[in-house]
Amino acid sequence: MKQHYVCQFNPTELAATLAPLQGRKLTILLAEQDCAQVALLQQLCSDLEITLDGAIFPQLLGAQGLLPQGAWLLPRPEPYQATLMPLPPEGDAAQLAQLITDQVASMLATWPALSPPPTLFLTFDNLIPNIASILDALYLQLANRVNYAGTNAGSGHFTPLACLFDNQRLLAYGVTCTLLPNNSFPFLEHGYQLSAQPMLATGSGANTITYIDWQPAFHTYQELIRQQFQHTLTHEELYHFAVHMPLGLLLANGDVIVRIPFDVTDEGALICSSEVSEHSILTLLKAPESATDHACSLARRLCQQQALTRAHLLEVYYCAGRQLHFGQQTVTELRTLLSDSGAGELAGALSLGEIGSIRSGDYPQFHNGAILCNGALV
């Protein structure tokens, strides 16, 4: 059985669809609108002895564009391992990274000998506030024993949602650790450009920026938007402006990491989609204008890794903020990516954070505003 999209959850029909996968491994990407169907999917997979891992996302993606409901059923060929882990909310980044390291080490112990380093694909609950720091600590432990990629699942409303599941459990505040073959290494692209002078995060912790250049962070962001658009930004408008003009972290190697503010505290602090360390160098970014340029670039990079054919599936995780920026042009970007890659089908989800490297072999980073994509035989 190849990948399969379902939008109806009739138990009899769904059981017949799943029957060819008896005894195999399956990933399910489930739209938030259908989150109540997890128990049915778990029961049917358990009845058929299908080893299940899954996650809930705001919406799904197909070659035709956004899919607001339904589920992607993605059979996984061997070798493939997936483990769902709860993470203690009180744990700091080093402690959580150690838990993940211990689990991944046990998975690597049974990975085929003499094969190239696999890809460690991490699916986090998006409400974990210190994912970037967890990645830093994880890299210190695992280094180049694996390649790194991943995504964030959860609610598009940024509200708590148990969004990760296996055959028995449905968890919030956890991570699914997956080992994929080396040839499934995903690539990442965002295309956001600098549009303002550098600033300093003079007060920040986890995913909250309190002060920028010693001024309340929201006030500073308001001033930047006023300069660009001659408009006084309100709290309610923040997220819809920020997907077009997010903040960026400037790294020492010249790379830029997107951080999208999505809420404001009563004190005027900005709550972002991921961490911003104190004393980070910030700038205002401008979202890409072209809905094709970066899709073409990503397709070229995929094709340089492997010769994609109509027998390949593109598995894509596309930032929900990027989708709000491009609107209807999201479909253009996805179709360009599929056609230029040469693959035959596209399946994926709107994500709430993307883990990967801008260049193959680079240190893993936690991104926003990005497309994460890989090609696999189906």
What are these regions (language model features)?
Residues 1-378:
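Hydrophobic alpha/beta core scaffold segments
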